[in-house]
Amino acid sequence: MKQISDGVFYCGLHDKTRKVFDQLVPLPQGTTYNSYLVKGSQKCALIDTMYVKFADKYMAMLSAENVKIDYIVSNHAEPDHSGLIPTLLEKFPEAKVYCSPKCAENLKNMLGVADEKMHVVADGEELSLGDKTLKFIHTPWVHWPDTMFTQILEDNILFTCDFFGAHYTANELWADCSPELALSAKRYYAEIMMPFAKFCAKYLAKVKEISPKFILPSHGPIYDESGVAFIENLYAEWTSENVAKKVILGYVSMYDNTTLMVNYLENALVSRGIEVVKTDIMETDEGELAMELIDSAGIVFGTSMVLTGPHPKSIYVAYLANILRPKLKFSAIIGSFGWGGNLTAPIDAMFTLTKPKKLENVIAKGRPKPEDFQKLDALADAILAEF
């Protein structure tokens, strides 16, 4: 346990061995699960708890502190933050869980927390711990509908749960504001927060209005005065409507026919002053692709035909590009087939939430021929016209 300020302590844990989050998101550095203890002059509160995998270590840490927990604040019901609430309620049977209405519903359904053990807070409600006052601020959809922030009014410390988080396991508790941290925060935003970018922008404005001294998220390092500006500026950039003069060219090729088309289009776009992020989607992890989607204007899928449709990996990438809801303005499909099937419809069908403009696809039969390369030049011109 580490002291953050007078009466405020960090009781989180590192999980450097975890390689994947939600069985989807790669974790190059593992992650942290941040929990906080607030000691008032009369009462004590935990702000979020711990992933159940670390139950023994977490409970031993609290026992060593010899503290009685009066309140458990659940900013968000996802099990990596709420998992030990039942265990804590057994150890501290008089404690109450303070949470949003939707969080109470989730805690009941997912963890079996009884209604009488929870107090549902109104937006703006306050709770006195004596010389410290907690204020609860409803912030749904960053990134679950149950999310809220908690503020210590006297210290102006803001607990933002997953908002401003990072899967970053540096040894230092305080953010170093390094390029490495910025990259981890960007990966986290892209994979988890980008589908809710409009809500992120809304609550970023709320945070700036509060102007907290410290920001304490539920993953990654915590932010002091300089760190607050660092993470706020990054989120302001990512949540803006701005896109770069950049195109993602994600491809998979079985016998290099599609590769020939991809390389030709890449050169055609670069010669027109367009940045191209070319990536073999059989090798690129989802996090890297998600980060590029934050500010890319368009995406071009390069795919081979597998039986009667596009390569399954292309469909998967299209699915991700849809559910992450990036600011894509346009998309196109290029590729090669042998004798029949439909290379484009299954990819186009993935875009139900994100609605990029569909540019003219270029599909070659077998090895691309001169007329196919001419069509790729026309596609490059069409892409340039979108800027």
Language-model features, listed with the residues they occupy:
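Short N-terminal or domain-adjacent regulatory/targeting segments
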Residues: 216-243
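FMN-binding flavodoxin-like domain, especially the glycine-rich phosphate-binding loop
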Residues: 170-173, 180-215, 219-222, 264-277, ...
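Metallo-beta-lactamase
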Residues: 3-6, 99-147, 199-204
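Active-site metal-binding motif and surrounding structural segment of the metallo-beta-lactamase
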Residues: 50-98
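Active-site-proximal loop/helix segment associated with metal-binding centers of metalloenzymes
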Residues: 143, 147, 163-194, 238-243
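Short acidic active-site motifs
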Residues: 84, 284-289
